[in-house]
Swiss-Prot record:
One of its GO terms (molecular function) is UMP kinase activity. SUPFAM superfamilies: Carbamate kinase-like. Keywords: Allosteric enzyme, ATP-binding, Cytoplasm, Kinase, Nucleotide-binding, Pyrimidine biosynthesis, Transferase. Pathway: Pyrimidine metabolism; CTP biosynthesis via de novo pathway; UDP from UMP (UMPK route): step 1/1. This is Uridylate kinase. Homohexamer.
């Protein structure tokens, strides 16, 4: 079953986890997987949709885990931010191999490898149909990449956040563990928060709600899934007011 067809989006934010880049590995980057995701993004960009991205860093380093093991939380979070830059550069390389112009923009200055975050410049890149990858989170510890994606999507005037996951939407319970799990077609921000449905962290959901920014949750593993939703089909859950 599919949800109601959403309107055509002109500018979107794609949020994926760092783990999505691992493939079947237990750590790091799997080049064929990175290339496959790049192809998905490229196919959407070729529709004329302006695409920006945020990629997590959990395939390389996760700040919360480092903190739990005795590392100072602030230091651990900064290490996690650096991991997102590595993932962003890998995705940039894969997209450029497909012939698409792409810019990595970091919230932490490292001018030798990527651009600093300047809002107007980032918007101009999107207007020129370049794919923009935002790296290093918000540039501040204690904020997740989900929150960073929602923040940047709001600043870029995106029409929706597309959250690519391992499942094809939001379920009332873990569909991997429970065969009777039911997928939501549409769900409100408040219900996601009240029922702890795990779409994004609470700060990200609250920010999306305050800015009336819909979140489309879909399976990143489904070939052509990202493009099919933008074309008016596909299976997903829409989080909205």
């Amino acid at each position: 079953m599919t949800s109601e067809t959403p309107k055509q989006y002109g500018r979107v934010m794609l949020k994926i986890s760092g783990e999505a880049l691992m493939g079947d590995q237990g750590f790091g980057l799997n080049p064929p997987t990175v290339a496959r995701i790049a192809n998905e993004v490229d196919s959407v960009a070729k529709m004329g949709v302006e695409v920006c991205m945020v990629i997590g860093g959990g395939n390389i380093f996760r700040g919360l885990q480092g903190s739990a093991q005795g590392m100072e939380r602030t230091t651990a979070d900064y290490m996690g931010m650096l991991a997102t830059v590595m993932n962003a550069l890998a995705m940039q390389s894969a997209l450029e191999a497909l012939g698409h112009h792409c810019r990595v923009i970091s919230a932490i200055r490292m001018d030798e490898v990527c651009e600093p975050y300047i809002r107007r410049r980032a918007i101009r890149h999107l207007e020129k149909k370049r794919i923009v990858i935002f790296a290093a989170g918000t540039g501040n510890p204690y904020f997740t990449t989900d929150t960073a994606a929602t923040l940047r999507a709001s600043e870029m005037n995106c029409e929706a956040i597309f959250k690519g996951t391992k499942v094809d939407g939001v379920y009332d319970k873990d569909p991997v563990k429970h065969a009777d799990a039911k997928r939501y077609g549409d769900v409100s921000y408040d219900e996601v928060l009240q029922k702890h449905l795990g779409v994004m962290d609470a700060s990200a959901i609250a920010l999306a709600r305050d800015n009336k920014l819909p979140i489309i949750v879909f399976s990143l593993d489904a070939p052509g899934g990202f493009r099919s939703i933008l074309a008016g089909s596909g299976t997903y859950t829409r989080v909205h007011v």
